[in-house]
């Protein structure tokens, strides 16, 4: 079971977006990276196609999972993730507050 999943609210721990929060759009486990909305924005020069115009577009670039932490459901601060078995199912738990992480 992954600690960070699509749809999770995360906090950036290091880099140019340190301290900012966003929602995980996509997780790439093989590369140990994730796409987070509004985080690690880069500009790409887009060549013209039949459907798109040419120009400079801004989009999210992947960020390494080690630079992300789950936001605690209670106070929004970064927390580590633990696991617990409840009703025969393995669930994620915030180490900071003990709250269950939805997902």
From Swiss-Prot:
Keyword terms: Ribonucleoprotein, Ribosomal protein, RNA-binding, rRNA-binding
SMART domains (UniProt xref): KOW (SM00739)
Recorded GO MF terms: rRNA binding; structural constituent of ribosome
GO cellular component, one term: ribosome
Disulfide bonds: none
The UniProt record lists the keyword Membrane: no
Keyword Ribosomal protein in record: yes
Entry's Gene Ontology BP terms: translation
Annotated function: One of two assembly initiator proteins, it binds directly to the 5'-end of the 23S rRNA, where it nucleates assembly of the 50S subunit.
NCBIfam families found in the cross-reference section: rplX_bact (TIGR01079)
Family designation: Belongs to the universal ribosomal protein uL24 family.
Subunit (UniProt): Part of the 50S ribosomal subunit.
PANTHER family: MITOCHONDRIAL RIBOSOMAL PROTEIN L24 (PTHR12903)
HAMAP family, sorted: Ribosomal_uL24_B (MF_01326_B)
Protein name: Large ribosomal subunit protein uL24
Organism: Brucella canis (strain ATCC 23365 / NCTC 10854 / RM-666)
Gene name of this polypeptide: rplX
